[in-house]
Amino acid sequence: MAGDVYPHFRAAAVQAAPVFLDREATISRLADWVTKARDVGAELVVFGESFIPAFPLWNMLYAPVDQHAFYRRLFENAIEIPGPQVEQLGGIARRHGVVLSVGVTEKGSVSMGAMWNTNLIFGTDGRLLNRHRKLVPTWAEKLTWSNGDASHLRVEHTAVGRLGALICGENTNTLARFALLAQGEQVHIATYPPAWPTRRPGANIAYNLTDAIRIRSAAHAFEGKVFNIVSSCALDERTIDEVSQGNSDVQSILNSAPPSASMILGPQGEPLAEPKVGGEGIVVADVDIALSIEQKQFHDIVGYYNRFDIFRLILDQRPQSAMTVLGNAVEATEEVRERDRSSLKESIMTVTAQDREDPAKWPRKMAS
């Protein structure tokens, strides 16, 4: 058939539990899950929020004065980018020939304490394509993670189409979602934690993570006419034991919290496979990018179905850092030396003939 051919592939949303705050063991577990996903034909494999080394559930469950040990363990097992763990993850993607997306806690190379909630995307060749830091840590997460920037809030061209990603609550942020759609996003990745406890057991107004994931995921797929690959982490007994440390109150809160969910949705917001609610497993579905074309006829909010003469979104993708260096240090030093030489020359030229005989009248630089 004549004309363009668009990507058609199989996606896998992995819902798995990490080995709590054990970076190396969790990467090994990730490799096993990628093998399972590849065995069923997956070409895009997605893992949940801060899968490596774990999601900081303790932020919601303990007072800040009781969180220091958790914070240190998280930092010690976080990932520095670039670094050996990034090379490992790239190697896993390359060996299996998949596009790999994984949530990590990233630590800074300068500060012994700065961490970010980050999503990494690797190409089939193992190259790191994108490192997106969550723009704003949500609620209690502010006790752990720093703000990200928009330097990597972008869509990547991959073997499975134009790929964008947002982390957890960012999928509530209309402007962040539109920024990806406006860059031509075809496949969206949304990642979530294993649980989100906001109330003690029995509260009938507690935040329902399962419903929140379902509503946001369908909304973005429908509004943007994109496919949405949604992956959450799973909550296992080891994590509950490690976080609760024998505290029955904390155990009760975690056991009663609404579970996470993983799913794959089409451009009408429809599930393409049975969602996975709670527990571990893989959601697998076939994605045909061309199916978005018909839906775009009805509502194309980054095309004809908008008024850009009325609405305007500005995206600042400049990286943010602790310090901005203007110029090269060596060049700056030479500039100072040249300025001093010029100043000295001018001082010498101001010495009159009669002053030459009286050193007390010499300019200081000449006298020295």
Q: Where on the chain are the PLM-derived regions?
A:
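N-terminal active-site segment of His-dependent metallophosphoesterases
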Residues: 1-44
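Short hydrophobic alpha-helix segments
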Residues: 125, 130-132, 275
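Active-site-proximal beta-strand elements of phosphoester/diester hydrolases
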Residues: 8-20, 118, 131-133, 161-170, ...
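Cys-nucleophile CN-hydrolase/nitrilase-fold catalytic domain and related Cys-dependent amidase chemistry
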Residues: 23, 35-124, 194-219, 223-226
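CN hydrolase (nitrilase-like) catalytic-core segments centered on the catalytic cysteine
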Residues: 79-101, 162, 168-283, 367
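Active-site glycine-rich loop that binds ribose-phosphate moieties when present
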Residues: 138-154, 169-175
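Conserved hydrophobic/aromatic positions in well-ordered beta-strands
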Residues: 12, 120-122, 263, 283
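C-terminal beta-strand edge segments of enzyme domains
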Residues: 227-228, 232-368
